[in-house]
Structures are given as C-alpha cells and as structure tokens.
Amino acid sequence: MPEPSKSAPAPKKGSKKAVTKAQKKDGKKRKRSRKESYSVYVYKVLKQVHPDTGISSKAMGNMNSFVNDIFERIAGEASRLAHYNKRSTITSREIQTAVRLLLPGELAKHAVSEGTKAVTKYTSSK
C-alpha cells in the first residue's frame, strides 16, 4: 500500500468548505458533501460591529446553531399563521408577525425595522 504524500497538507479538522475529491479504492473520484453554514455571514457581521475581535470555531458553531434555531422557529410560526388564515403562501407579512410573536419587546422592533429595510433594498435593486 503506497504511503500518503507529505507535500499536500491535510484539510483542517472541522473545515466546512471541503471541495477536494477523495480517492476511492477502484480509482474513481467522488466529491465530498458540502456542509452549509452561516459562518461567513456571522463573521461579516462580527467585523462590522467589532473589527478587532475574532471568534473561535466552537463559538461559531454555537452561532450557527442559534441562527438555524431562530430560522426554524420563525418559519414554523409563519407557516402556522398562513395556515390559520387559509393562505398557501408565506409572505413578508407572516414573517413580520412571526418575528413580533417570537422575539421580546425592543428586539422585535429592531428586527422588524431591519427586515423592512432589507426588503425595501432588495425590491429597489430589482
């Protein structure tokens, strides 16, 4: 059995961007599955708020779990609201109402304001 070459460094543990191809026994190459995460976006926001601060991979994992959890809660609540109102489409109105129901006080106000701003920016760029 040939020895693995030492020239190419092994991918870091926990690396999310695995696009290299793994070698199979029969010689065929297969792509590794891509692991989706919000880490790029969390990092961009961190640098906007605190440019001189870093984040550990464990903390990034926690942030990724947090974003996924909030996303699922908002989507679930918006789906319920659409169902209650006999609608088959989740619109920005359902999302906004779901955010108001799920997030407490001032946080909900800021989230709605930022969401409205993002939707306005998106529609004006079309």
Swiss-Prot record:
Modified residues (N6,N6-dimethyllysine): 58
Family in the record: Belongs to the histone H2B family.
Dimethylated arginine modification, residue list: 80
N6-(beta-hydroxybutyryl)lysine modified-residue sites: 6, 12, 21, 35, 117
Organism: Bos taurus (Bovine)
Modified residues (N6-methyllysine): 47, 109
Location of Phosphothreonine modifications: 116
Modified residues (Omega-N-methylarginine): 87, 93
N6-(2-hydroxyisobutyryl)lysine: residues carrying this PTM: 6, 13, 21, 24-25, 35, 44, 47, 58, 86, 109, 117, 121
Modified-residue entries (N6-methylated lysine), positions: 117
GO cellular component, one term: nucleus
Keyword annotations of the record: Acetylation, ADP-ribosylation, Chromosome, DNA-binding, Glycoprotein, Hydroxylation, Isopeptide bond, Methylation, Nucleosome core, Nucleus, Phosphoprotein, Ubl conjugation
N6-lactoyllysine modification, residue list: 6, 12, 16-17, 21, 24, 44, 86, 109, 117, 121
Modified residues (N6-glutaryllysine): 17, 35, 44, 47, 109, 117, 121
Residues with PTM ADP-ribosyl glutamic acid: 3
Glycosylation sites: 113
Modified residues (N6,N6,N6-trimethyllysine): 86
Residues with PTM Phosphoserine: 15, 37
Sites of ADP-ribosylserine modification: 7
UniProt PTM: Monoubiquitination at Lys-35 (H2BK34Ub) by the MSL1/MSL2 dimer is required for histone H3 'Lys-4' (H3K4me) and 'Lys-79' (H3K79me) methylation and transcription activation at specific gene loci, such as HOXA9 and MEIS1 loci. Similarly, monoubiquitination at Lys-121 (H2BK120Ub) by the RNF20/40 complex gives a specific tag for epigenetic transcriptional activation and is also prerequisite for histone H3 'Lys-4' and 'Lys-79' methylation. It also functions cooperatively with the FACT dimer to stimulate elongation by RNA polymerase II.
PolyADP-ribosyl glutamic acid, modified sites: 36
Any one GO molecular-function label of the UniProt entry: DNA binding
Protein name from the UniProt record: Histone H2B type 1-N
Cross-link (Glycyl lysine isopeptide (Lys-Gly) (interchain with G-Cter in ubiquitin)): 35, 121
Placement of covalent cross-link Glycyl lysine isopeptide (Lys-Gly) (interchain with G-Cter in SUMO2): 6, 21
Gene name of the encoded protein: H2BC15
Leader sequence residues: none
